[in-house]
Amino acid sequence: MRNFDLSPLYRSAIGFDRLFNLLENNQSQSNGGYPPYNVELVDENHYRIAIAVAGFAESELEITAQDNLLIVKGAHAAEQKERTYLYQGIAERNFERKFQLAENIHVRGANLVNGLLYIDLERVIPEANKPRRIEIN
């Protein structure tokens, strides 16, 4: 019997949680990559992504949503002064993080607070897909 590790898909797919909960049998989820992030289920139809972007100014961050793909980029402005580090433990590299969004997931806003970039998402169910009551005659 083969086991498939779906955790790499789960980390960057938002809105598919019901499907992954059925497919994923207590698979461990690793949080590799830069920058680190969390995906929070706020309620049944709302999600929040928190990305650790300490050291980035708001003007150095770019968020793009196209089709079902959310792209977050961070690019430091070119620094003119060369520094000599005795120890460098803080990552200062540029990044691009992509999140695959499920159908009907829309970005509602973003804000930067204390080095964390919060991106709010909402599942918007079209009227045609909502359950409707059928009258019995």
UniProtKB/Swiss-Prot annotation:
- InterPro entries in alphabetical order: A-crystallin/Hsp20_dom, ACD_IbpA/B, HSP20-like_chaperone, HSP20_IbpA
Which keywords describe this protein according to UniProt? Chaperone, Cytoplasm, Stress response
On the tree of life, the source organism's domain of life is Bacteria
Residue span, sHSP domain = 28-137
| Annotated Pfam families | HSP20
Q: Mind telling me which GO cellular component terms the entry cites?
A: cytoplasm
Q: State the compartments where it is located.
A: Cytoplasm
Q: Which ranges form a coiled coil?
A: none
Tell me the Gene Ontology biological-process terms attached to this UniProt entry.
protein stabilization
Quaternary data: Monomer. Forms homomultimers of about 100-150 subunits at optimal growth temperatures. Conformation changes to monomers at high temperatures or high ionic concentrations.
Query: Main role?
Result: Associates with aggregated proteins, together with IbpB, to stabilize and protect them from irreversible denaturation and extensive proteolysis during heat shock and oxidative stress. Aggregated proteins bound to the IbpAB complex are more efficiently refolded and reactivated by the ATP-dependent chaperone systems ClpB and DnaK/DnaJ/GrpE. Its activity is ATP-independent.
> Which family is this protein grouped under?
Belongs to the small heat shock protein (HSP20) family.
* NCBIfam families documented for this protein: PRK10743.1
HAMAP family given for it?
HSP20_IbpA
Protein name as catalogued: Small heat shock protein IbpA
